[in-house]
Structure formats: structure tokens, C-alpha cells
A protein has these predicted regions:
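Compositionally biased, non-globular sequence tracts
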Residues: 415-462
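Cysteine-centered metal-binding/redox modules
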Residues: 1-416
Length: 462
């Protein structure tokens, strides 16, 4: 790109999806070990913007110790005759794509969950100042969003300044989110889709409706509408809702068509209001993961910044890997925290009556949206530490899910002894045969007959 001749590293879409491993990184900015980090966009009057200016408040990249993790705030301030505050979320989310265009720079997540890494090779080439990154962002914003007439960017690493700006950023996010509450999916004829994360999750198509925020928690239905209107060929696009195929599950013909087209046929059916059968795909930037707990037939939820293991013994990273990458995994669902405030929150699965465990921090954030008769019956990490403790807690609190256990226990099952005897059961069971190995963990398999055949190669057939 000719506009980047003075930049010491290459810039282009070819670098989207580039991962920078810990051993290869110069520094980490934000991420799971840093408490306060953010990126925010604000629309300002023309006279308040110094066009093209890049400010660095605090130590610059070259001043940061190699291998360290540091707090970072990014403030993008834009002005233009056609700009209004309703476009702030649109401008802000473009940071994800634009920063990933930079060779040797990785950007993940959004808002207060941002996680960035600068690679050693790019640092050694001269990408050693936020001013260089700011120049790239300025040119990309002005080139791809012409309605931005003036733009300035501020990078903040000074902790006292971050402490000042962080609560302001959180207040801005909440203000945007609140605007979208109240509007229903049934009241609009257009949803919106986003493929910003396809560089990391090729088959992921995020469907944004009034009652279902983007997985990352950064794009509301109003943000999607604004983005599609100013950049109709961009990564956020309109989806005609189409015919309602399944009201309970949240299946729409337009969503299915868009998912199939944008995922290159990998995803053909999406149910928006359930975590089972055809759940919404998960990217990698989601704020939280819902995971099914078969022992209690309920859902647990764990957010990205949760320290330690969830009630099932697994940390967020492992649970995230179980559903990320644009896949549809039964009982696993990457989602935004804002979706937990929606009346369509897993509506087909029982909604909050199906949730049994949530970290205290998340529970406090969404407490006002949990039905009052269930809020104290949902366990947190302070109440239970294991599945057995969770079972006892749910029984003691008379959680609605317990009634379902009783019903299932009392339902007569007609089956032969052959059907109900486990073929195998073990906490970890390795099976080796024919040159391959399968490891089953905490599995009980019931079957009347199991046949495993090794497929013959052409040479063997001859």
C-alpha cells in the first residue's frame, strides 16, 4: 500500500489472523493479567480535534520492558459533518480489524477486554512507538470511512490517567447498551451480521438482533444498522429477517441464508435462542462462555477475566477453546454479557431457570435482569467449588432445575438390561487400535453393539 511507505512494517489484510505467541512477543498490552484496559471512540466537535495528531500519555513502546504486560487505553476522537454519537461503537470496533492489518501486531477482544501483543521482529524493524501505530490507524480510518473529516488518537499507558478514563469508558459502554434494550426482534424486519472475526474464526457469522448483542459485546442492533448504512460493503451488513421458521428456538430463514453464504456453506442453520442443536457460532472474542453441566442438567457461565476454574474444574481458556473458531458445539456458547440482560436469553432452554452457576462479578453486573425468585438460587464461586457441592446447593435452595431431576427420576424407562449396562466406564479410558488412539474422560458409554472398522487404503484394497 503506497500510503504506508514510511511505516517500518507491512500493513494489509494478509496479516489478519496472525497470532503472536508469548515467546515471540516484545510486549503485551492489556490481556488477562491486566485489570484495567480499554478502547473507546468519541465523536467530538470539529474545533476540538487536531487532525492527524497522535498523543502518547505515559511510557512509549520502546520504554516498556521486553516480555512485560502493561495497561493500555486507546481513545479515538473523530469529527465530521455526518458523524453523530450513534456511530461511536462502529468507529471503535474498526480498531480490531485495522490493528490486525499491521505486521507483527495482534489485537483480540474489545472494549474493557482488549488484549494486544507486539512481536519482537516488528519491534526490531522499527515498530517501536505508538505514534507509528497511530499513523496507520489514522490513514485507515480516513481512507475507509470518508465521513470522518478529522481524527486524533491517544494511547495511554500512564496508570493515573487510565484510572481517570477507565470509569468514563465503562459509562459510555453502558449508555450505548441501554439504548438497545426494549426493542424486540419481532419489531424489526432487518437483523445485522458481522464477520470482523473471520480472520480468527473462518466459519463464524455473528448475528446481531435487538435482543441478541454481538458475541463480543461491542455491537448492538443500532450499531449494526449505523455501520451497514455508512459502509454497506464492509464487515457489518444487513440481514433480511425473512420468514419465522421456529419462534421458540429463534430460527429465521434470512439468518440461515446469510450464515450459509458467509460461512461458505459450513453453517446452514442457526437457532438464536438456544445453546443446543444449532446454536449460534462462537468466534474467539466473546465476553463469556455458557457451558452445559450434565450432572445437574443446567448451565454454568464464566467470563473472560475470571481467575481460576469454573465449577466443572475447567478454566475459561479451556472452555473457550471448546467452542471457539466458528463452530456449533452442543451445550457450549460464546456470548456477550449484554445477552444475559435480554428476555430472549436462552429462552428455548428455560432462560435463567436453566442457569445454576455464575461468577459473583457477573452475577452482580446482571442482577437486575435475573428474575427475583431465582437470583439467590444460582450459585457462585463463593458458594460451591465442585459439582457435588453444586448439587447440594441447588437442592437446598430449591432451584427450579431440581424439579426437573425429580420428574426425570420418576419417569419409568422401558429398557432391557442389555440397553442399560454400560459397555465401558472410567474417569480416563484410553482405547488403542489400528494405529489410532482415543481417550475418553469421565465417560459412560451405553450401547447394544459397537463396531469400529478401519477404512482400507487403495494399496490395501489392491
Amino acid at each position: 500500500m503506497s500510503m504506508f511507505k514510511d511505516i517500518p512494517v507491512e500493513v494489509g489484510v494478509i496479516y489478519e489472523g496472525e497470532r503472536i505467541r508469548r515467546n515471540d512477543m516484545q510486549v503485551e498490552l492489556g490481556g488477562p493479567t491486566v485489570d484495567k484496559k480499554f478502547e473507546i471512540a468519541k465523536v467530538k466537535p470539529m474545533e476540538q480535534i487536531e487532525d492527524g495528531k497522535v498523543f502518547v500519555v505515559g511510557p512509549d513502546l520502546k520504554d516498556l520492558k521486553e516480555g512485560g504486560a502493561y495497561p493500555l487505553g486507546i481513545l479515538v476522537e473523530a469529527a465530521g459533518a455526518q458523524l453523530d454519537p450513534g456511530l461511536e461503537g462502529v468507529i471503535e470496533r474498526r480498531l480490531h480489524g485495522y490493528l490486525n492489518y499491521i505486521e507483527g501486531f495482534m489485537h483480540l477482544n474489545q472494549r474493557y477486554d482488549v488484549w494486544m501483543r507486539l512481536g519482537k521482529k516488528s519491534f526490531q524493524k522499527g515498530l517501536n512507538s505508538f505514534e507509528v501505530i497511530g499513523k496507520v490507524l489514522y490513514r485507515l480510518f480516513k481512507n475507509e470511512l470518508p465521513i470522518i473529516e478529522k481524527l486524533q488518537i491517544t494511547f495511554v499507558t500512564d496508570m493515573s490517567k487510565i484510572d481517570e478514563l477507565y470509569p468514563q469508558a465503562l459509562a459510555s459502554y453502558e449508555s450505548r447498551d441501554a439504548k438497545a434494550r426494549g426493542l424486540k426482534d419481532s419489531e424489526v424486519d432487518t437483523f445485522y451480521g458481522c464477520v470482523l472475526c473471520q480472520s480468527f474464526a473462518p466459519s463464524h457469522v455473528c448475528v446481531i438482533t435487538p435482543q441478541r448483542y454481538s458475541n463480543c459485546g461491542a455491537i448492538s442492533w443500532f450499531d449494526g444498522k449505523a455501520s451497514a448504512s455508512i459502509d454497506p460493503k464492509g464487515p457489518i451488513f444487513a440481514i433480511p429477517r425473512g420468514e419465522m421458521l421456529n419462534e421458540e428456538k429463534g430460527e429465521f430463514s434470512g439468518v440461515n441464508e446469510a450464515a450459509k453464504k458467509r460461512s461458505m456453506g459450513e453453517v446452514t442453520k442457526v437457532w438464536l435462542y438456544t445453546a443446543f442443536d444449532h446454536p449460534h457460532t462462537s468466534c474467539g472474542c466473546f465476553e463469556a462462555v455458557t457451558f452445559y453441566i450434565p450432572e445437574v442438567d443446567g448451565f454454568g457461565i464464566v467470563q473472560r477475566n475470571f481467575k481460576g476454574a469454573a465449577v466443572n474444574g475447567l478454566p475459561f481458556s479451556t472452555l473457550a477453546d471448546s467452542t471457539a473458531g466458528g463452530r456449533q458445539i452442543d451445550g457450549f456458547h460464546g456470548m456477550s454479557l449484554e445477552y444475559m440482560r435480554s428476555s430472549k436469553f436462552f429462552a428455548a432452554d428455560g432462560g435463567w431457570n436453566r442457569v445454576v452457576w455464575v461468577p459473583k462479578e457477573v452475577k452482580e453486573k446482571v442482577k437486575d435482569f435475573i428474575p427475583k425468585d431465582i437470583v439467590d438460587k444460582i450459585a457462585t464461586e463463593e458458594d460451591v467449588k465442585s459439582i457435588d457441592e453444586l448439587k447440594a446447593f441447588l437442592k437446598a435452595k430449591n432451584h427450579p432445575i431440581v424439579a426437573k431431576w425429580v420428574t426425570e427420576e420418576e419417569t419409568p424407562v422401558s429398557a432391557s438390561a442389555e440397553d442399560t449396562t454400560p459397555v465401558m466406564t472410567a474417569s480416563t479410558l484410553p482405547i488403542s487400535a489400528g494405529g489410532f488412539r482415543i481417550i475418553l474422560t469421565d465417560a459412560k458409554i451405553y450401547a447394544s453393539k459397537v463396531v469400529i472398522k478401519k477404512e482400507e487404503t487403495k494399496a490395501e484394497k489392491r
